[in-house]
């Protein structure tokens, strides 16, 4: 990908990077492991973004 990106695309990629995280440990502890993984997790090679 080009180093010089449009600002809108850069913001969308940054938001996707931040949202691609595990739930915090305190959430897993508070829900007694009922919530262990995020339904919105995305693997960089399997699922591509429409950014």
From Swiss-Prot:
Family stated for the protein in its record: Belongs to the eukaryotic ribosomal protein eL39 family.
Sorted UniProt keywords: Ribonucleoprotein, Ribosomal protein
GO biological process, one term: translation
Annotated protein name in UniProt: Large ribosomal subunit protein eL39
Keyword Cell cycle: no
One function term, GO molecular function aspect: structural constituent of ribosome
GO-annotated cellular components: ribonucleoprotein complex; ribosome
Ribonucleoprotein is among the record's keywords: yes
Region entry Disordered, spans: 32-51
